[in-house]
Each structure stands twice: as C-alpha cells, then as structure tokens.
A protein has these predicted regions:
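Extended, charge-enriched "interface" segments that sit outside catalytic cores
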Residues: 39-101, 105
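Short, solvent-exposed loop/turn segments at secondary-structure junctions
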Residues: 2-4, 30-33, 117, 155-158, ...
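Short alpha-helical segments and helix-capping/turn motifs at coil-helix boundaries
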Residues: 5-13, 128-134, 220, 241-242
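Glycine- and acidic
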Residues: 64-79, 99-117, 147-163, 184-193, ...
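Alpha-helical packing segments of well-folded alpha/beta enzyme cores
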Residues: 3, 82, 86, 90, ...
Length: 378
C-alpha cells in the first residue's frame, strides 16, 4: 500500500491525476503449505490443536482463532516449546551443513534478504560491531549481555562492489567475534553461504527476531517478513514495505518499530544530508566505523574497507548512519521483552494469529477479483 501510494503521489503522479481509477494495489502473500505446513510441522500441529481443525492450511484467515489462546499460559508455553525444538533442529542442521556451533539457548536474530544498500545490512553489522566494542571496552559487562546469535543470509549482484564488500565485512566480523573468548557465549555471527529455500525452511521456524530494517520508502513489499511472522518470530523494522501492513494487523505493541518515516527521509534529503555529522555525534557509531577502518576486521590492513567507509561518511544514500541511534536504542526494548519468555512468546503467538491475511491464496483472489475481473475455476 505504501509504495502504491508513492507511485500515485510521486513517480506516476501525472497519470494518476488523469486516470485515478486505473491504480490499485495487491499486497504480496506467501504459501502456507510450504512455509508453515512443510517447513514447520511442529507449529502446524499446534495450530491444528488450537483451532480444532486443519482447514487453516487452505484458509489462513482461520489463524485469527488462535488469538484468544494468547491469554492461555499453558498454550503459550507449548508455543514456546515448539520454537525451542525448532532452534535445536536448526543448530544441528547448521553444524551438519556448515560446521557452525550455534547455541539454541541464545536468541536467534536473523537478517536474510538480497544484499543491497537500501536493505541496510550495513546498519545491522555496525550495530553488532558496536555491541562487540561495548563488551571489549568494558562499557558493558559480559555477564550483563543477553546472549544473541546473529544469522545473515544474502546474495549480491555480481558487479555490485559495495554489496560484495559488505558480505566480506560480515564474514570477517564473524571470524573475529566468534574466535574472541571475551564474548564467547554472548555474541556470535554466522553467514551461511548460498542462502536458498532449503536453508530458509530450517532457519525461519527457528528465528526469534527478524530484521526488516530497510530505509523507509525503498522496499516495495517483501515477503520474508510475512514468512517469519507466520512462524512466530517478532519483527524489528521500519515503516517500509509490507512492514506497514504487518504492524497494522498484529498491533503496534507487537512490533518493534524504529527509524525515520518516508516524509522524514525526504525532508532530510531536501535539507542536505551529511552522514559525517552522525558519525561525529555518536561515540558508539564512531567506534564501530573506526574499527572497520583501522583493520580490526581485515588483519590490520586499513585499505581493505576504504571504499566502504568512504561511502558511509560522504554519501550514505540510504541513511544508515542517521538511523543508527534509533536502531541501537530499540535493542534495549527488545532485550527487556526477551528476558520475559512468556510475554515474548505471547506476542509472537499474536503475530501468528494475525498474519493470515498474508497468504498467497488471498493475493491470488485479489488479482482475480480486482485486476483480472474473473473468478476461480469451478
């Protein structure tokens, strides 16, 4: 809906003014057969138990019937047990396929999507570096850190240099952090290669927190956020793409919102965005970028990430630095809720119950009725 409105108001405004009735919108959807029934059999069985029917597989709006069960502590505990079992399964899968030692008792925090500057994997990895620096400097005692496992998955276009640099940086940060005894058991980073549907079917059901942190106004819709919400992950995100509709349906109190709006982004562009101002004003952001620049993650070679750092400090077209403060601030809210497992899982269950709208079946019905002006075959 957000991007359809942007097309009407900005990109295709002249056409929209003349032919307003020719513009409509169909929100994406995902298939519950693959991404819940097949990928997450434990959750599927629990949903069927809670609803008393398996008809939800072909009528996903029936998930709404789970919402009253969020008040039932025993059902919420069953829901939490499903998530924990899925995390154990993913840990075993990651060890077998990649050699990763993932602790299923940590928060599994996932960011999987195409590698592009507007999707802002750089924002996530800079926040990880800042947390690492906090622990190393003693700013935060290791014992006070909530254990977190960060999982990235991405591919970049072959000629997209800055995206390739970002992938290399994430892997090098993972290498340093995962081998540092000072943060052992508190912070780990993994980048499984060749992200694909097979891996997704193991990772998505195991995820506690999903990252949807693109710059507001740049993501057309997205379907990853729908898959994660349907599988009981909480979302941290901006008001962009389908995040807007997910937040409306699951409730603002069940979504971790941060960052600038589209209007605020446009206003900052108009006044002249200077990323270096944010670098100089935020000691944690400065420390993180300086660690990238000084060779901490490139075996002491300061030239490896010169281009990436230069882009952050002089261009930063998608305002990673401007949203860094808001993004790191929301982490304390996330961790406070995660420290209350019953309440976290209650909200995660509410996400599942209110995500039925995001079925590909509903998308197809919308296309049939509003675009193609036809109906299903009898």
């Amino acid at each position: 809906e957000l991007h359809s409105q942007l097309l009407k108001d900005v990109t295709l405004k002249n056409f929209s003014d003349v032919y307003p009735d020719k513009f409509t919108n169909v929100t994406n959807g995902v298939t519950p057969r693959r991404f819940v029934k097949l990928a997450n059999p434990r959750l599927s069985d629990l949903i069927t138990e809670g609803l008393g029917t398996d008809k939800w597989v072909s009528d996903l709006e029936l998930l709404k019937g789970l919402e009253p069960l969020a008040a039932d502590d025993e059902f919420v505990k069953k829901f939490a047990a499903v998530k924990q079992a899925n995390k154990v399964d993913f840990s075993n899968y990651a060890k077998r396929e990649y050699g990763f030692d993932i602790d299923p008792n940590t928060m599994i925090n996932t960011m999987v999507k195409r590698l592009h500057e507007y999707k802002r994997q750089a924002l996530k990895i800079l926040a990880v570096i800042a947390r690492y620096a906090d622990i190393k400097s003693g700013r935060i005692a290791a014992d006070d850190v909530m254990p977190r496992t960060i999982v990235f998955g991405a591919k970049a276009a072959p000629g997209y240099y800055l995206a390739k640099q970002t992938i290399q940086l994430i892997n090098n940060v993972a290498r340093v952090i995962n081998n540092d005894p000072d943060v052992k058991g508190k912070l780990n980073v993994y980048f499984p290669w060749n992200y694909n549907v097979r891996l997704a079917q193991h990772l998505i059901p195991a995820t506690d927190l999903d990252e949807q942190i693109s710059q507001a106004g740049k993501e057309a819709s997205g379907t990853g956020n729908m898959k994660f919400a349907l599988n009981g992950a909480m979302t941290v995100g901006t008001l962009d793409g389908a995040n807007v509709e997910i937040r409306e349906r699951v409730g603002a109190e069940n979504f971790f919102l941060f960052g600038m709006t589209v209007d605020e982004v446009d206003a900052l562009y108009a006044e002249g965005y200077d990323p270096k101002k944010y670098y100089e004003a935020d000691p944690r952001l400065k420390a993180a970028i300086d660690m990238v620049a000084d060779g901490t993650f490139s075996n002491g070679d300061k030239t490896v990430y010169e281009d990436l750092v230069h882009d952050w400090l002089t261009k930063d077209w998608f305002m990673t630095l401007a949203d860094f403060g808001a993004y790191t601030a929301i982490q304390s809210e996330i961790e406070a809720l995660y420290a209350q497992p019953l309440e976290w899982n209650r909200k995660a269950l509410i996400n599942v119950a209110n995500s039925g709208y995001f079925s590909s079946d509903r998308s197809m019905e919308d296309y049939l009725e509003r675009i193609w002006m036809t109906g299903p075959l009898k």
